[in-house]
């Protein structure tokens, strides 16, 4: 009796300079935000893949509160930004980025951030980052109704935190800024396109 077995796909190493890889990657990508930090983070990641990729930024609604609460709500905001950007442009894929906060069982609070990538075939990728404990004084202001960025502006006596170094830049004393924290999660969300053989259903052969 013939037995079926799954064929393992052939994998290749991505060096960032593969002509074969570039021929199947996107040439036009949209990002669902005009926030300069978000746009710069996407641009930096795409430049490591293919400098010639066209990036279009569009202002879209996230469909969630200005201060998302919890990973699920933050993910939903990122997804809805990506979907709206795809609908509003002629891009082949779109990226949505959303930052939020998570209330933990012990009453403390942490930050979170998510990236969602969608393309016109319906494929989706998601990546998360920025799980960082928030000081009690920051958490208290968020519980009172402030956004994280506005709370940081008030406490650090600055302006435009979320359009610059971000809360993470202040709370890590500049060790990493918001753009630097966003770049890894964008890379994670692109994994299904960067290494598609790992994500496609394996072929089945029969002896």
Where are these regions (language model features)?
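Acidic, Ala/Val/Gly-enriched low-complexity intrinsically disordered segments
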Residues: 1-3, 19-20
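Cationic, low-complexity basic patches in intrinsically disordered or flexible, solvent-exposed regions
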Residues: 6-9
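Aromatic (phenylalanine/tyrosine) cluster motif
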Residues: 11-14, 21
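Short glycine-rich loop/turn motifs that provide flexible caps or phosphate-binding loops at active sites
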Residues: 15, 31, 95-98
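Intrinsic disorder/low-complexity detector
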Residues: 19-22, 121
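N-terminal polybasic phosphate/anion-binding patch
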Residues: 22-91
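Anionic-ligand binding patches
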Residues: 67-207
């Amino acid at each position: 009796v013939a037995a079926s077995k799954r064929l393992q796909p052939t994998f290749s190493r991505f060096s960032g300079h593969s002509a074969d890889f570039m021929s199947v990657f996107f040439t036009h990508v949209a990002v669902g935000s005009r926030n300069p930090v978000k746009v710069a983070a996407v641009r930096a990641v795409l430049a490591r893949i293919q400098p010639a990729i066209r990036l279009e930024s569009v202002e879209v609604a996230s469909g969630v509160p200005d201060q998302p609460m919890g990973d699920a709500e933050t993910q939903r905001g990122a997804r809805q930004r990506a979907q709206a950007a795809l609908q509003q442009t002629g891009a082949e894929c779109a990226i949505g980025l959303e930052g939020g906060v998570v209330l933990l069982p012990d009453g403390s609070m942490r930050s979170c951030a998510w990236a969602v990538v969608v393309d016109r075939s319906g494929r989706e990728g998601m990546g998360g980052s920025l799980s960082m404990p928030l000081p009690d004084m920051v958490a208290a202001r968020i519980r009172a109704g402030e956004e994280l960025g506005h709370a940081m502006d008030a406490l650090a006596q600055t302006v435009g935190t979320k359009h610059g170094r971000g809360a993470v830049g202040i709370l890590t004393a500049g060790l990493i800024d918001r753009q630097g924290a966003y770049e890894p999660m964008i890379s994670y969300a692109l994994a299904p396109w960067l290494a598609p053989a790992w994500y496609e259903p394996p072929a089945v052969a029969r002896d």
